[in-house]
Design a protein with these regions (language model features):
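Helix-loop-helix
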Residues: 1-46, 92, 196-197, 209-225, ...
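Intrinsically disordered, low-complexity regulatory regions of eukaryotic regulatory proteins
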Residues: 1-2, 42, 54, 67, ...
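Intrinsic low-complexity, intrinsically disordered segments enriched in polar/basic residues
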Residues: 5, 27, 38-40, 59-70, ...
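Intrinsic disorder/low-complexity detector
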Residues: 10, 40-42, 46-47, 57-58, ...
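Juxtamembrane extramembrane loops of integral membrane proteins
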Residues: 25-121, 607-612
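General structural signal for secondary-structure boundaries
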Residues: 66-77, 84, 254, 259-262, ...
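Soluble non-transmembrane domains of integral membrane proteins
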Residues: 80, 84-357
Length: 612
């Protein structure tokens, strides 16, 4: 009977290990680093090509800029209007009215170093160009000389700085009867509102197709492409590339897939065009940051576009052609999100400002039905407690409470099986080596006593999707980035930095990298605690009598310790808390059923055998 208990525990442990090994295969651990702008790099970034309004009109010619050595030089090439709020700073270029300079003031590039903020957008002509352009494509009798393009220099009508309380107004006259106006606003977070109006002073009706595009040069995309390629044998846990909402469904296109789309000779690029309703949006998303075009109240074509010659990746929103009668003025409004993927912020835009399913821009993964409520609960707990580490522990307590009825039945079943140990010994004496008779008698005893020997595996099996979902939450949650816990844990999104090599955090030395020979010695304190708590949990039951089983059982905690040592410390904290609560639950339930676990005896049983 005791062997049955131990077999159940071993089976559960082996299943967990197989799941972890599968996880490592399909979701290899990546040393995820944001793409830093190399201030000394030389680039030949070109300005994005405006789309055509129809197949009958060619796209605007490729417009290139003078090669610049640094981001700062590229910024100085054009006249600018400052952008300033409590959360972002940067500028927009009067050339093309491009939003191409943006830093996120709440986020540092390095932990505890406020001197360098995360740079989201950078100008064309500099390294790692990443910018947003809005405009009109000509239709009918018009051509690109009649509309403002990426190199058009706008004049300032009003406003010399863009803030949440002060919009800016721009103007451009084509000197042929058309005057283009632009009003740009920003809220207190990351949402821009772009209002474009056209005054038709000609004697003819005109047709124009509004568009917005987000353009990135290769370095940003190739960094993500490299991560996707490094895991091409499996499935990378994080989507990076285009994310779009068609109004009815969410679609994703990886950076690595964009060059594989059908080639368009007219646009000299690889294209994928998806029809979207007036509830849709499209943009680029990464692990923590996102830029998104949101055409308001207008159906549009969502476009994924890759230009090999220019090494440029684009996401476009091509709106329906509008007609402006002679003597009339018409306005088109759209929004732009450019900022951090903060759960509370993007949920607000979705719930309160009508951006459909905007919260789904966070990559929830295959267990989204578990991940989403877990994500929401974790953030609620963090808002109440004020610390993500303690919020993870509180979440673990809630999960254990929800699963307690199953755990109770499981542990009661295990306790009752211990009570049947004397009867099992009698059956062994009675049937001897007749395994078939022994098995039949054992199953009859289980049925009579209403004991399920497999019940001990159920709580472990239920934890598998929970483990995957929590890992997903911790991996993609921006709020865990640079979030401290206690002691040496300053960033819950990365592995425990303590190790034997730095005397567990007492010395200011970094742990070796994942490819180092000494990585085996870089197991931190929290992974060690995880191994110890798992080992203690085992000691609630005597070791198996079978030597092979006993050896597997003995090594299991320490194998798990090394396997999970490279995971985010937030996940290891969950595992330690889960092991501790499971130990308390099992010990209490076993005592309530009249079974007194001999923990110390099980710990030192091996040594006693050696003495004898």
């Amino acid at each position: 009977m005791q062997d049955d208990n131990n077999k159940n525990l071993i089976l559960a442990s082996v299943l967990s290990m197989l799941v972890l090994l599968t996880w490592f295969y399909f979701f290899p651990q990546e040393d995820y680093q944001p793409v830093a702008t190399n201030q000394n790099a030389v680039s030949d970034n070109g300005i994005a090509i405006a789309p055509s309004a129809s197949n009958d009109i060619a796209s605007a010619p490729s417009l290139t800029t003078t090669v610049s050595e640094t981001r700062e030089i590229a910024l100085e090439k054009t006249k600018r209007i400052e952008i300033k709020s409590n959360r972002i700073e940067g500028s927009l270029s009067l050339t093309g009215a491009r939003i191409d300079d943006l830093k996120l003031l709440d986020y540092n590039v390095k932990l505890n170093d406020a001197s360098e903020k995360v740079t989201l957008l950078s100008p064309a002509g500099g390294p790692s160009a990443y910018y947003i352009l809005h405009g009109f494509s000509p239709a009918g009798s018009l051509d690109f000389n009649d509309v403002p393009t990426a190199t058009t220099v706008w004049s300032i009508e009003d406003g010399d700085i863009l803030t949440p309380s002060s919009p800016v107004f721009l103007k451009w006259n084509n000197n042929n009867g058309l005057i283009f106006y632009r009003k740009i606003e920003i809220d207190d977070d990351y949402m821009f509102t772009i209002s474009r109006s056209v005054e038709n002073n000609t004697n003819s009706n005109i047709s124009l197709a509004p568009y917005g595009l987000i353009a990135q040069k290769g370095p940003i995309a190739r960094a993500a492409y490299g991560r996707q390629e490094s895991s091409k044998n499996g499935v990378y846990i994080l989507h990076e590339g285009i994310v779009l909402q068609t109004g009815s469904s969410l679609e994703e296109i990886d950076y690595s897939d964009m060059p594989d789309e059908d080639f368009s000779s007219s646009e000299r690029a690889n294209l994928k065009i998806i029809d979207s309703s007036n509830k849709g949006w499209i943009g680029f998303t990464g692990k923590y940051w996102m830029t998104t075009l949101i055409p308001d109240n207008s159906a549009f074509k969502a476009v994924s576009k890759y230009s090999e010659n220019a090494d440029r990746y684009q996401a476009e929103a091509r709106q329906e052609t509008i007609q402006i009668l002679a003597g009339q003025t018409k306005e088109v409004q759209s929004r732009l999100f450019a900022g951090a993927k903060e759960y509370k912020t993007i949920k607000h835009y979705g719930d309160k400002e009508g951006v459909t399913d905007f919260v789904d821009s966070i990559d929830w993964g295959m267990f989204f039905f578990i991940t989403k409520p877990m994500f929401a609960l974790l953030h609620f707990l963090n808002s109440m407690i004020g610390n993500m580490g303690w919020a993870i522990i509180a979440l673990t307590l809630i999960i254990k409470t929800i699963l307690f009825p199953l755990a109770y039945k499981s542990f009661v079943s295990m306790a009752r099986m211990k009570e049947l140990q004397p009867e099992m010994e009698k059956l062994k004496e009675k049937h001897g080596d007749d395994r078939q008779a022994m098995q039949k008698a054992t199953m009859e005893m289980y049925r009579t006593k209403k004991v399920n020997p497999a019940a001990g595996c159920l709580p472990i099996l239920l934890q598998i999707p929970i483990f995957f979902s929590l890992y997903k939450v911790i991996f993609v949650t921006l709020e865990l980035r640079h979030a401290p816990f206690i002691g040496w844990l300053k960033d819950l999104s990365v592995p425990d930095p303590s190790s034997l090599l730095n005397l567990f955090g007492l010395m200011p030395w970094d742990a070796p990298g994942p490819n180092s020979f000494f990585v085996i010695l870089s197991i931190g304190v929290w992974p060690i605690l995880m191994g110890i708590t798992m080992w203690l949990q085992q000691k609630l039951n005597p070791a198996p009598t079978d030597k092979t089983q006993a050896m597997i059982f003995a090594w299991m905690p320490w194998v798990f310790m090394f396997m999970l040592g490279g995971f985010a410390s937030g996940l290891v904290i969950y595992w330690v808390a889960n092991n501790t609560l499971t130990f308390i639950q099992q010990y209490t339930i076993m005592r309530s059923q009249g079974v007194n676990p001999d923990i110390l005896g099980n710990m030192f049983k091996r040594f006693k055998k050696e003495e004898n």
